[in-house]
Amino acid sequence: MLFRSRETLRREALEIRAVCRRYGVPFLINDAAELAAEVGADGVHVGQQDMSPRQARAILGPDGIVGVSAHTVEEARAAQAEGADYLGVGAVFVTGTKENTTPVDYETLKEICAAVDIPVVAIGGVGRNNLSSLAGSGIQGVAVVSALYAQPDVRAAARSLRSQVEEMLRG
């Protein structure tokens, strides 16, 4: 079990925020709206079992970014109705970063994208070898972990994946 003290988390968050600001990248913290507000993060991402988007918005204020995990059209619509700025939908593929997940199939992903007016980001097992299978779904981006951090050269992997994502989204 990994445990980090609140002060360690706060210090690390401030360091990450500084790097993100330097490169013009929004900094969102997963499942910790209070910490996000405390360190001046740009936003928070919450899961279905975490606080509601409305609660996160109350903590972050009107300008904070609130992302919500969704797996069904119903969850997506509810998140949008409660003020989510974007949805993270998935896992869309089998992934090593989340155990015991059943992937959201392409048709459901497409239905979610059609059902909401906020950006949808596909997450979970997304990488260079399967990215193209998400084309035409309506997503507006992807979130990745292993596609970058499992690579020997993270910077090169990020550049390559970004190029591939941009090409896929252009259609």
Where are these regions (language model features)?
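Residue-level preference for alpha-helix termini and adjacent loops
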Residues: E34, A91-V92, P103-D105, G125, ...
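Loop/helix-junction capping segments adjacent to catalytic residues or to phosphate/diphosphate-binding pockets
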Residues: R6-E7, R128, Q151-P152
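Glycine/Thr-rich beta-alpha phosphate-binding loop at enzyme active sites
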Residues: V39-A41, V46, S69-A114, D153, ...
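Glycine-rich phosphate-binding active-site loops on the catalytic face of alpha/beta enzymes
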Residues: Q48-A58, G88-N100, L131-Q164
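A generic short-segment signal for beta-strand/edge and adjacent turn/coil regions
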Residues: E12-E15, A36-A37, V89-A91
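Catalytic cores of alpha/beta
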Residues: F27-D42, A56, H71-G83, A115-A122, ...
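Short, small-residue-biased leader/transition segments that mark boundaries at the very start
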Residues: M1-L2
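Alpha-helix-loop-beta-strand connector modules within alpha/beta enzyme cores
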Residues: L9-L28, Q48-H71, N100-R128, L161-R170
